[in-house]
Amino acid sequence: MRNYLLKDSAIIIYPNGKFTVCDKKELEAVSQKQPSNRANFEINISGSSRLTLGEDQIVYKGLNETEDGLELNYEYNKEHLQITTELKLIGETNVIVQKNKIKNIGDSTVKLTRFSSAFFEDIAYSEDMPWYKNQDIRVSICHSKWQGEGQWKKYTLPELGIYPTTIHDSERESFKINSVGSWSTANFYPLVIVEDNKKKNTWFMETEGSHNWYIKLASYGGYAVPSLSLEACGCDDANGGWYYDLKPNEEYSSERAFFGMTSGKFEDAVADLLVFKRADSTVRFNDGIMPIVFNDYMDCIWGIQDPKLILPLVDKAAEVGCEVFCIDGGWCENEGGKSGLGDWVPKAKFYDMDGLKEIADYIKSKNMVPGIWTELEACNSSAYGYRMNEDSVLKRYDTPIGGWRGFYNFSNPEVREYLTGKVEALYNIGFRFIKNDYNASIGIGATNNYDGESPAEGAIVNANTFYDFVDSLYEKFPELVIENCGSGALRCDNKMLRRCSLQSTSDQEFYYNNPSIVMGSMAVMPPEKAGIWSYPYPAMYPYADGKYVPFSPDDEYYDRMKDGKETVFNMVTAMTGYLYLSGRIEYCDEKNFALVKEAVDFYKNIRKYISVSRPIYPLGMLGINEEKTAALGLISDDRLLLAVWNITGKEETVTVPLSDYLKSESKINAVYPSNAECGINASSVTVKLGAKEATYIEINL
């Protein structure tokens, strides 16, 4: 038996090759526990049941200590398979990163129908009380939908259908969150957090990959040997139809999973994962200074990329202090022989490529970086790239996926070369920021040239080749910044997020719904990557009955905006992450424009703290349709940034309990807006807010 210590927890490797994770304080007790024969990965072979540890099945062959973790080796002699489990132990955290590899060392092809990323048991284990008698276990799940991302809910085990009913040692009680398709976070974020509030310990499991996945919470052993487990899997025939024909001498790798146990609560698990995700990210801004973006789409010009509309916005964005100006959708041709999606040719009625360069030059003349919207994976049937060759778009059973609105096949070298050329053309005329969108899912997968493998495996192959393509863009264009947008945050799993500088948190159009989305999003992505729309002076979606209605604010509109409350609320929300400004700010009156500029200046002083902070939730999470007060804190070693919202119809004095974080010498350093009414003592912050008002407070700890 071998033990390895992490920050609060320990990993125990039993003689049969089984490993588990426990509180360091309970290491001795858990070490004495008889381990089950369930391996820390799941393998199914066509025509067989789940394989387990044992002499006639999976045999443990020992471990090797590596530079940053462990390598455990197994064999399944009946099918001549070697399995390697790589465990990376993330320093100063409780995070364990697991990846499994399986190799066929025999002479015959083996058809795999499940190959999971991670599995571990003994959650909430106690010598004195089985898990099903512990009434203090809570399971947190992050629900998601378009314009409603980041919706965390807490459940009891019985509410999820997990309760023992038998003495038999089989998994019959389980709950699963899953995704099928390339919108990997459209329904759930792939993370489950289990809190044992009795012992103050928390377990977590997360996986990654822009394709099919599931995370399963299950019980084994019934009443006799009760065990609670978590499993993460991206390869399963029962979840999207995955299978893989593993040929002789071939090796296959699972996706990574991140799991562990921390002493503490939900926020502590999030903090551990945040440390890992920051270290795992391949792109970060120097010194954590995120350049402020103005994007002309949301509640702004909505894709009507007429220079007569763009240029006044450029002027005002520069005046207010923005550092990037991004031209969003609508700049490219979508009529006649060219396609808006796939060919990336400027819309002739507005400008040609030289005209686009003139706009980029104008943006640069205002000391801002030019940015532009793309959807590099998509192509209309009229696009040249769609018919470049017979394999340029993704197909399923020889039929293009998505019909007229197809998807490029990134396994095709010609596609990668063609799109690299399109990015290069934009780069050469000055664009250094790309907002890359993704507005449809490929479903269960694709069957292009994948040697007869399942569509689900095709989805994995295409996702990985697209990741490689993104990495190649950074190598070729070193000044390039890429934003990931998947109809908001419908594709924001870590494998995509780690290679992008920022992530759109939502396409939400109503400012008062954003705090809920933002608070939940902070638990799944680094705050400095969480791109948050702020749209003071919003122009709502301009198409009524299919007809375009130009924005024309009337007296009623100006009267609604004159007190500045909506502007402040917008800016407070966006300043909790990556400030992403929009709205028709060229119409701002003097008061509102000053409030926008005050916020931008405030943000420039505090953004360096955001990039080293972790989120706290002193008033809990906020549901998207809840009308109550809410608070989000971002805490670092010597600083607490606190946003407080009143999403009710009446004035409130909000008391935010912070006794775990404040000291007697803690003091308020700055507030936004500057006339906000707030106070501080050693245990709380108090803020007076009218209906639909918000305040941002910087506190020196």
Which ranges hold each PLM region?
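Polysaccharide-binding surfaces and accessory modules of carbohydrate-active proteins
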Residues: 1-223, 240, 666-680, 685
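Active-site-proximal substrate-binding groove within the catalytic cores of carbohydrate-active enzymes
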Residues: 4, 466-678, 686, 691-696
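Active-site and adjacent substrate-binding regions of carbohydrate-active enzymes
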Residues: 100-102, 329, 333, 363, ...
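Short, structured beta-strand/loop micro-motifs enriched in basic residues and often containing a Trp
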Residues: 228-237, 677-680
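Short Pro-Gly-centered flexible turn/kink motifs
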Residues: 244-263, 691-700
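Terminal connector regions
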Residues: 260-291
